Amino acid sequence: QNWLEQHGAVRIGYLKNDVGISLVDTESEKPVGIINDYISLVSGYLGELAIEFQLTGFESQEKELQALKDNRIDMIFHMNQNPYEAEQNDIILSNTVFEINVAVLTGVKKFDENKENTVAVSRNNLLGKWYISFNYPFWKIKEYDSSAEADKAVQSGEADCFVVKAGQSLKTLEDSKMRSIFLTKSGASCFAVTRENTTLMNILNKTIQTLPDSRLSSQFCVYENAPG
């Protein structure tokens, strides 16, 4: 509590184009998604002392990480569980806050997630790379300049698959010859803070304990499948 009193509002960094989590609405310019559910569920959890949050949107995960290192934000909402990458980036990760079902789009007739596959990833998709290297370390990551290029690589057979949130896989499939296959490992999403900021991490882990079980994961599906 002392930390919050001295520090004031907790500055959250989020991704502006993160469907279901923090997709910025073009009219209100505010994020829509489970970031709002988290804030409303936990802001009063410490009793008399309400936790205040201040939101800043970013175009990419790299920019979020840089802002965290520069002390322009206190935490990132959200990263994927990956202890090795966290250590490389001098950050610590919270307990899992919510989980997302993940699918691959592939042209391979008999796709097997337990074999070594070549996965196309757009260069700036840090979350995707963290998810793959943690859950499927034996897959070979091939980077492309954009998700459109990654898509093309799979269509042409240059790569076996690319990874998407399960809900979006169906939208992408409408205009493609590929098929969507759900992976058995979900994406475990967590908060990130700098390594020194253990007090805030303790506070965040306590807020996660107060969340109704899998509430945010199920809310995520509602947002992701909303028409639009």
Give the label of every model feature segment.
Residues 25-28, 90, 101, 117-118, ...:
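Residues at structural and domain junctions
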Residues 27-34, 56-60, 68, 96, ...:
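Extracytoplasmic/periplasmic, Sec-exported soluble proteins
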Residues 80, 103-172:
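Pocket-lining segment of extracytoplasmic ligand-binding domains
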